[in-house]
Amino acid sequence: MNEQYSALRSNVSMLGKVLGETIKDALGEHILDRVETIRKLSKSSRAGNEANRQELLTTLQNLSNDELLPVARAFSQFLNLANTAEQYHSISPKGEAASNPEVIARTLRKLKNQPDLNDATIKKAVESLSLELVLTAHPTEITRRTLIHKMGEINNCLKQLDNTDIADYERHQVMRRLRQLIAQSWHTDEIRKQRPSPVDEAKWGFAVVENSLWQGVPNYLRELNEQLEENLGYKLPVDFVPVRFTSWMGGDRDGNPNVTADITRHVLLLSRWKATDLFLKDIHVLVSELSMVDATPELLALVGEEGASEPYRYLMKKLRARLMATQSWLEARLKGEKLPKPDGLLTQNEQLWEPLYACYQSLQACGMGIIANGELLDTLRRVKCFGVPLVRIDIRQESTRHTEALGEITRYLGIGDYESWSEADKQAFLIRELNSKRPLLPRNWEPSNDTREVLETCKVIAEAPKGSIAAYVISMAKTPSDVLAVHLLLKEAGIGFAMPVAPLFETLDDLNNADDVMTQLLNIDWYRGLIQGKQMVMIGYSDSAKDAGVMAASWAQYQAQDALIKTCEKAGIELTLFHGRGGSIGRGGAPAHAALLSQPPGSLKGGLRVTEQGEMIRFKYGLPEVTVSSLSLYTSAILEANLLPPPEPKDSWRHIMDELSVISCETYRGYVRENKDFVPYFRSATPEQELGKLPLGSRPAKRRPTGGVESLRAIPWIFAWTQNRLMLPAWLGAGTALQKVVEDGKQSELEAMCRDWPFFSTRLGMLEMVFSKADLWLADYYDQRLVAKTLWPLGKELRDLLEEDIKVVLAIANDSHLMADLPWIAESIQLRNVYTDPLNVLQAELLYRSRLTEEQGKSPDPRVEQALMVTIAGVAAGMRNTG
């Protein structure tokens, strides 16, 4: 670890030095001196020097409005560079071992050493691997795409500099390129001027595919194949690709009026266009490479006399022509032109697969396996992973929108008001209509705009090429009728196949009722016939934690999954659990390996489907090497969870979790819902109101424009508390509950749970991570600078609670200090703190100046507003997550 960390520190220091030179060139020595003074004071403050801490506060408070932005940008950009270096070191030879693809080899060796597992069982588990990653446009990716691209280039420079054989003149060239990139970043505005549209967000997703996943996925499969061959003597079949990508960008309309049916239609076309573009590049390479003459009779028959001299090239050129014709047609459609479909339009993956696989088989049969297993194999695997759609799209809509649409229809037909019917009456009506052969929608009927939008969305699904829409997710699902309603609306749109419809259970009550809802659905004969033995259910992490606090929410999530697994197993249904996790702890985020092994036994039998959100997409899939690492971690965790499932918790442990859940929920809600001072305190102690000015995502921060904390989305709720370093949503209630159980004489039982139950140990580990990022003196400083004195007691109470929570968690985990088991992460947080602290202090000062200007009725100072936005972005970089 020391060697790894010293290499990271060395690179961070080098990048910081280059940034300093850039600042000096751009703004002069005096600004660099000011930044250096602040950095040294921050470092000394972190080491416990109280006098230097006070001097740091005074220095930052006394900055002139002209100095605010350069200082904020200096520390913010440094943190982005530190994150780039850290990402590189997680995949470099000197980097963290646990992030290396070697993790698969270690898992396979561990499995082979189990007396009750043989190679055939492990092979079967590999063959049933299924991983679907759902990229979402949650507005937590605060870094602009142009800067992300430059960071990727900086990463390449670090890789070249790491080469011990690099010649001096080459090193000089790389350093010059590094200086150019850092100067480009400095002279680029890090804050977007406008909110991205849903189409912009979709394009960002396609850029991730092009720049990283396109190469990362075949590389991961080569690595997996190599490890399987070495450890099991087993080769992956050519058509076996266990990973798929889906996107919510352009499909998630829950609370986002900007995502319309037309937008979804446009994004589907755009996605197909991007797929043709990427496959064309692959085929250009194959046309160049596959110049061989020898071919099987089958391939020669396929190409005929015309292609006999260069059969492989001939087939590739024909495929290239089809791709070009398809791309031209898609371009015309995107421009709004109505053109007839050309002959050979590519709409299905088989059209791509067949000519490529014919070449592969012929090369293998003619003794040219080494060529077949080169670029051609990579392209075949891309066809299986990405295919014609590139990424499939999920449609997500809130349950009440479907209820309102059906209410409007039934009122128009004069058969009553669907919205006011009982659940039993709704189900009876829906099942009757689902079995009916006549249409429900009246002709020449003019629905309201909202209802038209719901119906148009269903029409888009019906028109889309089969396989381009992955699932229909119903947010805030509460009852069986919520699921049946969507099936009816899809039937009315003319969808002739069983579209996967996934209810999303996301509040505490809904999670507790999830099993009952699914049991009722599975008891309906029509429904059982429709789903053909497969069911997807989405578990909401963000909103349940916001509703009840992390401890109660995580236990409700565990119990809901456990009950659903057992119900579906009993009914002979293959269940896919879809995890709606965020990147932050308060939204269910946890290291992938730990998170998966902490789920109930059997939860991964139907594969893993999980959201990858916002800034986590960049951290986990921003580079091809990082993609290989992340997919390897998921693979090893799924194999381990399925072959060495965690133990069923003892009844006594379940009872303790029930107790912890009740106490933590009461404590959490006691503050968040019932304390009259809480909302005013939240609004003043955090930049919650100012976050709305940041042009992050296309989705509004609130589900409804008015209302308090309950109407705020989970992301800005977490984002705000992360900024002031209290991190409140990620721990409030948990420590109080643990302390109460300890006082009841159950500490030894809690220690046993921590040792022997992955679910509980992961919860404590996540709390330790949060505590490491929280900071009492900074949270206190926000109060002193921004909060009315009448609210100070509440702030002190919360900070005292946090301090007590840290003590009780350390006692149960038997740790002397936080993150004792993860020194790399602990060191990383400490490294960034020196640069994040000044941004926090500066942010509090800027919030004070901005709010004072507003109170005085003056126009906002653009220098203050811009610097404030930069501190928000900088703190997000320092915390490594936003919402």
Swiss-Prot record:
InterPro entries in UniProt: PEP_COase, PEP_COase_bac/pln-type, PEP_COase_Lys_AS, PEPCASE_His_AS, Pyrv/PenolPyrv_kinase-like_dom
Annotated GO CC locations: cytosol
Catalysed reaction equations from the record: oxaloacetate + phosphate = phosphoenolpyruvate + hydrogencarbonate
EC number: 4.1.1.31
Residues annotated as the enzyme's active site: 138, 546
Biological processes, Gene Ontology terms: carbon fixation; oxaloacetate metabolic process; tricarboxylic acid cycle
Keyword annotations from UniProtKB, A to Z: Carbon dioxide fixation, Lyase, Magnesium
Cofactor(s) the record lists: Mg(2+)
Alphabetized Pfam families for the sequence: PEPcase
MF GO annotations: magnesium ion binding; phosphoenolpyruvate carboxylase activity
HAMAP family: PEPcase_type1
NCBIfam families noted in UniProt: PRK00009.1 (NF000584)
PANTHER family: PHOSPHOENOLPYRUVATE CARBOXYLASE (PTHR30523:SF6)
Family: Belongs to the PEPCase type 1 family.
Record's protein name: Phosphoenolpyruvate carboxylase
Organism encoding this protein: Salmonella schwarzengrund (strain CVM19633)
Gene: ppc
